[in-house]
Each structure stands twice: as C-alpha cells, then as structure tokens.
C-alpha cells in the first residue's frame, strides 16, 4: 500500500501544481499553510491538495445554487443606481455653472480640427450709415404703384441696353484687330506681290514709255 502511494506521488504533485496554477490568490494561500510547506510525506501532500481544492471552490461562484436569490451587495446597488441619480437626470441649466464653460470649451475645441472651422452663419448685409442724418426712403415706404413702376423699369432697362448693342454691331463691321490672326493690311498682304493694278505704283512704266518716245524722236531728228 505504501509502495502504491509512493508511485502516485508524482501524480499528486502534478495535480497540486495544476491547482496552484489556477489562480494567484489560491496559490498564495496554499503555500502559506504549514502543510504545503512540508511535502516530504504523502499525508502532507494529500492535505495540501485538499486545502488548495477547498480554496479554489471558495473563490469560484457556484451558479446552480441559490446565490441568485441573495440580495445584491452595496457596491452592485450603487453601480446600478448611479445612472438614475438626480444629479444625472438634472437638466443642463441646473448643473454646476463651472461645468458649462468647460463644456463650451470642449465644443469649440472639437470644431477646430475641421478644415472649415466653425460653421458660419448666414451672412448679413452691412448697414448703411448716413452722416448727414437723412435716410433714404426705403422701398417699403413707397406706395404699391411706384413699386410696380420701379420693378418694370428695372426689367425693361436690360432689354433696351441689349437692343442698342445689337444695333451698333449691325451698323459697323466688327474687325478683329486685337487678335494676332486678324486680316493684315493690303500693303503687307503676301509680301506685296499680290497687289492689284490700281494699287501698284505706275511710275516705272511711265518712265519706260517716256524713254522709248524720246529715243524715237532722237532717231527721227538724225
């Protein structure tokens, strides 16, 4: 019997090591006991294993039992009731005034990392200030008939301006002188070789005829 127990000593030691490795707290409690410090005898080994097993079962909760019927602890109750506290349900106006500027600072800071910055509101037109103290009459103070006349004049003016521009274009030919590819003057067209008969100067031809007539007269005189 003793020989069989001695053969099982390595197995008991292995089981003891597994139980101790299950948790740091359990392992500390096991090794602090005097029975686990002296493992020279088989009786001490068995007692140490039973001690570690009992500590391990005490640490782990047993769900099949009636533990769910027990009232919760004060810490659990505080964690559950914290979101329902009056401080959490109070509106923002009743909160601490010191917390509101912090909230605004956080909000403004959160908008700074955007490229477009804070959202821009509707742009307002600048208010005209008259130094002479006389303000012009607004359109609202005018009667309905005068407002209609102003509206019709504003509508008709652009049409009249466009008609005048079209008439000017029809009267005068539009020349693209400011463009590089516009038509060059007649004197420089094709280098001056394609001039008409009227455009060319007739002086060389007249001098040629005069010379021929003078030579004929000289021959007749001789």
UniProtKB/Swiss-Prot annotation:
It is found in: Secreted. Residues 29-105 form a propeptide. Residues 1-28 form the signal peptide. It holds the Pfam family Op_neuropeptide. GO terms for cellular component: extracellular region. SMART domains: ACTH_domain (SM01363), NPP (SM01364), Op_neuropeptide (SM01365). Specific enzymatic cleavages at paired basic residues yield the different active peptides. GO terms for biological process: neuropeptide signaling pathway. GO terms for molecular function: neuropeptide hormone activity. InterPro entries: Mcrtin_ACTH_cent (IPR013531), Melanocortin_N (IPR013593), Opioid_neuropept (IPR013532), PMOC (IPR001941), POMC-derived_peptides (IPR050878). Keywords: Cleavage on pair of basic residues, Endorphin, Hormone, Secreted, Signal. Belongs to the POMC family. This is Pro-opiomelanocortin-2. It comes from Cyprinus carpio (Common carp). The gene is pomcb.
């Amino acid at each position: 019997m003793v020989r069989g127990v001695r053969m099982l000593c390595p197995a008991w030691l292995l089981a003891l090591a597994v139980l101790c490795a299950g948790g740091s707290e359990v392992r500390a409690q096991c090794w602090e006991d005097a029975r686990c410090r002296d493992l020279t005898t088989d009786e001490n080994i068995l007692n140490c294993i039973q001690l570690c097993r009992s500590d391990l079962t005490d640490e782990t909760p047993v769900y099949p039992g009636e533990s769910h019927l027990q009232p919760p602890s004060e810490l659990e109750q505080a964690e559950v009731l914290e979101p329902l506290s009056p401080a959490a349900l109070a509106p923002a106006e009743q909160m601490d005034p010191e917390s509101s500027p912090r909230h605004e600072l956080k909000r403004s800071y959160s908008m700074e990392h955007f490229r477009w910055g804070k959202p821009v509101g509707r742009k307002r037109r600048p208010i005209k200030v008259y130094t002479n103290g006389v303000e012009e009459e607004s359109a609202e103070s005018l009667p309905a008939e005068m407002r209609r006349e102003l509206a019709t004049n504003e509508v008709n003016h652009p049409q009249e301006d466009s008609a005048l521009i079209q008439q000017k274009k029809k009267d005068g030919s539009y020349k693209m002188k400011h463009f590089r590819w516009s038509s060059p003057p007649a004197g420089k067209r094709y280098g001056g070789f394609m001039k008409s008969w009227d455009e060319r100067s007739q002086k060389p031809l007249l001098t040629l005829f005069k010379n021929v007539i003078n030579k004929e007269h000289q021959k007749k005189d001789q």
